[in-house]
């Protein structure tokens, strides 16, 4: 399996649509302007390959048609953020996840599951984790 196929498998969600972000060259307060929207077509291998190559920003919709998910995320937008301290705390709590620095300097914490789980159950658990990390007000996806 190549990287695009692995990512498409890891980010399985709603099969009828995906997110897309178009970034303009226009800047406001130092940040590039972007417009995100839903495209009512499935997320495909070709789209994932374009995303990896930097051609088009896309995103999977985590919740499937049965209100279940196989991945979720925390979006921490608190600054300054000590990423090493965050990772140490997650390891201390024995939370299996992947931490990525966001473009703005915050963090995206991704969780992946072998089986589909209730989106509500994930949100409840993610809220517990975010509170334990001291970031109880962060965004939870889904």
Where are the predicted features?
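A signal for specific C-terminal beta-sheet/loop modules enriched in small/flexible residues
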Residues: 30, 40-44, 54, 101, ...
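Helical (often loop-to-helix) elements that flank the catalytic cores of nucleotide-handling enzymes
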Residues: 82-92, 112-137
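Active-site-adjacent loop/helix surface patches within enzyme catalytic domains
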Residues: 71-77, 81-102
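Short beta-strand
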Residues: 61-64, 97-104, 139-142
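Catalytic "initiation/cleavage/transfer" segments centered on a nucleophilic residue
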Residues: 7, 134-142
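DNA replication initiation on ssDNA origins
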Residues: 1-71, 80-85
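Histidine-centered divalent-metal-coordination microenvironment in nucleic-acid enzymes
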Residues: 73-74, 96-122
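Short secondary-structure junctions
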Residues: 17-21, 95-99, 136-138
